[in-house]
């Protein structure tokens, strides 16, 4: 009986871990989609739909090595606090900012 309970417990744990992996995998895709949607609605007007910036506005090219070499903390700080003419997005949660940084990283050349 005790051996059966151990096997049942191990199977339950394995099922829970598998379910958690599946849930987090789909969540990550949703977060990427959410970050892309936020980029399109809040950022693309100045940074361009492709993230390459707009020369007339002197906005940075997110695909450039100069932007891509910045640390996640630096990019997060600019998103959260703004810089120059860029407004601060203080209402974004830390997870949303992290997802936006990941999206910006995906734009590299």
Model-inferred region functions:
Residues 32-60, 77, 83-90, 106-109:
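Periplasmic/extracellular electron-transfer cofactor-ligation site
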Residues 21, 26, 66, 88-91:
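Short N-terminal micro-motifs specific to bacterial/archaeal maturation
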Residues 2-15, 47, 69-74, 89-106:
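Periplasmic c-type cytochrome electron-transfer domains
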Residues 54, 66-69:
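Short, flexible, glycine-rich and Lys/Arg-enriched loop motifs at helix boundaries
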Residues 21-22, 37, 60, 101:
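Short non-domain terminal segments
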Residues 1-33, 109:
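N-terminal export/targeting leaders of redox proteins
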Residues 62-64:
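PAS-family sensory/regulatory domains
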């Amino acid at each position: 009986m005790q051996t059966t309970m151990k096997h049942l417990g191990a199977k339950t744990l394995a099922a829970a871990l598998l379910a958690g992996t599946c849930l987090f995998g789909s969540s990550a895709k949703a977060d990427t989609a959410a970050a892309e949607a936020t980029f399109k609605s809040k950022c693309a007007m100045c940074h361009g739909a492709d993230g390459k910036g707009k020369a007339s506005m002197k906005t940075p090219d997110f695909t450039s090595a100069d932007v891509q070499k910045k640390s996640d903390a630096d990019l997060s700080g600019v998103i959260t606090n703004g810089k120059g003419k860029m407004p601060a997005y203080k209402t974004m949660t830390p997870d949303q900012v992290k997802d936006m940084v990941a999206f910006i990283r995906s734009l590299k050349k």
